[in-house]
Amino acid sequence: LKLSHGAGRLVLGAGAAPGQLLSGTFAGGVRQRAQRTGDRLDAHIEARPFVVPPFVSGWQGLEWNISLNREVPLTLRLETGASQSELDLRDLKVTDLKVSTGASKTDLTLPANAGMTTVKVEVGAASLDMVVPQGVAARIRAEQGIAAVEIDTARFPFSNGIYESGDYSSAQNK
């Protein structure tokens, strides 16, 4: 599933009904594409191109509130621009996550029970707060540009360029 969101607010979490991949509200409109191959569905939801006249005051941008199916294993690609994003993946089965964001504020909670989750985050002039739920191990490689990086070294000790949970190799969820 790929979500391409522009300027505005994106709220993402679990809660779509059984039989639905997702449900939600999409102020500003969307374009959607989906292709099914066997038991795999590739879906892309993106903001509709638009121009906001300079005289429109109070325009807040796109407002998307999306609930995903908590039972479906997901590869999730998120592209955001100048936005505020609240991404609560705690109850989702996201196995592969890529987040690309520009001038934004992003709060991201990783999955708690998805097994192995691979995460790649690319940020521009952004604020990112990422939470690894208790009971989830992590191996973190942080390449920082102008962004400040703070990692709980008591939980994820640093060694050989990597922050890693002591139980990473044996953890069920990581």
Q: What does each of the following model-derived ranges do?
A:
Residues 1, 68-76, 111-119:
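Extended, structured, electrostatic nucleic-acid-contact surfaces
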